[in-house]
């Protein structure tokens, strides 16, 4: 069974007793066995006969027996067959090839139709490889979407085979059927779904390949019951962002410009877009939408919805968050002395430079874009959650369970203190934060990179990409303008801008028939009162403890449309 922390949030099974995990996780010897029958692939349209037919189709299409059928769990033989697969098989044979691959590996396969994009949109299907949800394939028909999903899964498998170390020691007795959980650790699974998602969204010839080096993402984990009652987890990429800079110009007050285009910030904004979509799915999608949504109605006086039990959020970040976490020489000392270290104070990106907020002149702060560092925002999200003020009307605080940092040069101890020690919350008198806001612990992991972190000179330094589950493609934002990149001088607003979120907020309010929310005139006024109070109290604590005042920009949120 998975453990539960004090806040009721289940810790990742692979990190049940860890708060910092700089080394590789190794599976425990007490893993529950899997029924032999569970080794056969489970698909929506393929049984045993279907797998045999799929193999015949694949062999016929590729002119020979590329994947010879063998007993489920014949891992060495399956590896040899997989290494002979064509790099880019025809879409028409992808489903057959994937089915036979999984049969030989003893890994269950299920094709899941995804309707989060809503009625009238293209079909979307994803492949579930024994708990690992691969990026969705889309198409004008279910068959086309399924073929694209199979291609994506095959690309992931081939990528794993190209790793220098084997996925599993061939001499290891395979007493149980292989599953993704026994092949990959938590941090590897997070990196795998991010890597597969990037490969799906960016072709090898894409001019934005270099943007992968700054990727950050949010992975949604669902705990599901296996065939004999044991639990397993599925991992799915739901939000993604890239970028390494912010807009350096004047403040914009219409809500149509993205000021901060750092990868982690963009991924979090893409997550907000995902949850607004989920709210529409659960309210307007009927019984099927309620079943597919990750949200469930919540009785009582609080927010009307909450995450379903067994659903968790994980962050993946390629680079050490800018700001305090970058100072790997931060001395180990008492909490009070560390808090007063200059490197520990709030820092902001202003006019292309990262500097302590106390060094920013008020005239500059009130007129120019100033964005707090990613280190500071992680500390804020550990208390206020990822959801922000608009979603707070509909959902309780959305806290991430873990953070996988792929930068090999980061210092785990510094990162932990940067996130969890600022500001200091009084354990005797209480934090004075309004309910339900509390500081939560992010379980930290060192994970693998999905792309070179420093690809060299590139035009991508001035661009930011974003995507969330349900979007047909990535959106490319010009950091200098904070708008979508186009050939014209000024592009359209991004789908992640404040004005877009205010529109989504009103759409959900109408769906829930809440006229009191529709009467809120401006973006700032639309933020839930408990959230605003918690944000104000957090800013006060930071200032009182000498860490700097959280920059307030009330005029930025005064727009109405």
Curated annotation (Swiss-Prot):
Per the record, which residues fall in region Disordered? 1-53
Give the knockout phenotype: Male mice are sterile and show defects in germ-cell development.
Residues in A to I editase domain copies: 239-560
Q: Does the keyword Disulfide bond apply?
A: no
As for subcellular location, the record says: Nucleus; Cytoplasm
Q: What residue stretches are annotated with the DRBM domain?
A: 90-159
Entry keywords, A to Z: Cytoplasm, Differentiation, Nucleus, RNA-binding, Spermatogenesis
Question: Listed GO cellular component terms?
Answer: cytoplasm; nucleus
One GO molecular-function entry: RNA binding
Tissue expression remark:
Testis-specific (at protein level).
The answer to whether keyword Cytoplasm applies is yes
A GO BP term, please? spermatid development
Which protein family is named in the record?
Belongs to the ADAD family.
* Role played: Required for male fertility and normal male germ cell differentiation.
What is the protein name for this chain?
Answer: Adenosine deaminase domain-containing protein 2
